[in-house]
Amino acid sequence: VKQKINLYTKIAPCGCLNSFEDQDFLKEYKYWFLALNWEQGFLGRSLLFLKTHKTDEIELTDGEVLEKHAVYCLWREAITKAFNPDKINQAQLGNEEYLHRGHLHWHFVPRYRRPIHFFGMDFQSDNEETQKLSYGSVHKRAVHPADIRQKIKEEILKYL
């Protein structure tokens, strides 16, 4: 297991993302990096962070936009092979800017319309009513143990 010491400082030298040390780093790209969200109510929930300070999509360069799309497609393929979600929600809210201090980011949230189990745990799935709602209104906020997140990370990285 690789240590995460100073990892976020290396990726974003401004230090703004140091509070995200509990996020499980997945992969670094030129402009972005992927991290597993510590809240795994929906199995495979991930974050895509911009390395530089920008708070709105209109500020992105063409290179950043193209890479964001490419990374999403790579992640989508990996998450499909790993867990086969029925749908993906994407969200870019920016409501907690005090946490990331202006690093634009997206939430990638796999949704499942069937019971989903992994590594001996049950994860959140949708029923007919909840599948119509945004993930923010139905997800269960719970930090999952590091060993579970590590197994999820390993499964995604097999395909990423």
Role assignments for model-derived ranges:
Residues 1-54, 150-160:
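Active-site microenvironments that recognize anionic phosphate/pyrophosphate groups
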Residues 3-16, 110-160:
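C-terminal helix-cap and adjacent tail motif
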Residues 30, 42-45, 84-86, 102-104:
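A generic structural signal for short beta-strands and their flanking turns/coil linkers
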Residues 80-87, 107-109:
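Short, internal acidic amphipathic alpha-helical interface segments
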Residues 83-98:
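A short glycine-rich, hydrophobically flanked beta-strand micro-motif that places a catalytic Asp/Glu
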